[in-house]
Amino acid sequence: MLSSKLLDINYWNKFGKRLINELINLIEQIPKGYVTTFKELAKALGDPIATKFVAMYYKKAPHWYRVVSSNLIVSPMQKALLEKEVKIIGNKVYAPIFKDFKSSKPLLELQKIQEYLVNKIKFDYPEYDYVIGIDIGYKNNIIALAIFDKNKKLIETKTCKHNIEFPYIPTYLSFREGIPIVNILKDLDYTALYIINGHGLSHPRKMGLATFVGTVLDLPTIGDAKKLLYGKIKNNIIYAHNMPVGYFVGHYVTIGNRTNLEFLKEFIKEWNSKKYLLPIEVADKITKCGRGDSNPGRD
């Protein structure tokens, strides 16, 4: 039942709308005379990391002006609406912070899926005939695949359209990008190693985009990202969850699924390029032609 849900793009697009509606509902629970913060709303959704999501969508609620930053400073427009309800001196609010939200905490549902998939992670020395780089762009809704043979010869490139409506929330990128990637890869007939523009085990719940795709489809995957999402670096080795999970080589290359650290080191020596591993560098160029730099982030 879980696997069929993970393949259903419409289900996850609806879930994304549910998140936005839940946020609106939470804001409308704030009584007159109270305010709340972005962080309190994120916690009510199930994870304080969702503050950026709250900041992106809170103005969809009729009483959005009751949501303030943690320093309680408000904008002139917000002040004009809020000063009829609470005390404001200068541009600072003096009012009780509402925290008693009634919420279904939808982000906890996503965490449970991530925790379930963690049990499917495998460490292996993969066998493959092709190496496929995968990147997603948003301007023209493109997923790009750069397909190489083992001799680093580019065999072909593919582009597919996607219809992603799930919002961007840090550490939940798999439910935004992983679902359409899984739907494309499940129909490919390649014995391949997949390099995905995102993270692997360097994720708070070991479930970066590369690990998500790898565990759902039981494929060998590697994550390759510009920035470190989670963990620490010592001597160019990336550590997360008290174990080495990858290497910093100007970008962050981490184990996704069915690979291991020794294999990763050998693969990087052969396939590293200027900005990314070669397959991602090619896929990234394809999506940039269509999207510019509008992608909000990479998990």
UniProtKB/Swiss-Prot annotation:
The record marks 168 as: Interaction with target DNA. Its cofactor is Mg(2+). The keyword Cytoplasm applies. GO terms for molecular function: deoxyribonuclease V activity; metal ion binding; RNA endonuclease activity, producing 5'-phosphomonoesters; single-stranded RNA binding. Residues 1-80 are annotated as: Probable methylated-DNA--protein-cysteine methyltransferase-like. One of its GO terms (cellular component) is cytoplasm. Coiled coil: none annotated. CDD domains: Endonuclease_V (cd06559). It catalyses: Endonucleolytic cleavage at apurinic or apyrimidinic sites to products with a 5'-phosphate. SUPFAM superfamilies: Methylated DNA-protein cysteine methyltransferase, C-terminal domain. It holds the Pfam family Endonuclease_5. In the N-terminal section; belongs to the MGMT family. DNA repair enzyme involved in the repair of deaminated bases. Selectively cleaves double-stranded DNA at the second phosphodiester bond 3' to a deoxyinosine leaving behind the intact lesion on the nicked DNA. This is Bifunctional methyltransferase-like/endonuclease. It comes from Nanoarchaeum equitans (strain Kin4-M). The lineage of its organism: Archaea, Nanobdellota, Candidatus Nanoarchaeia, Nanoarchaeales, Nanoarchaeaceae.
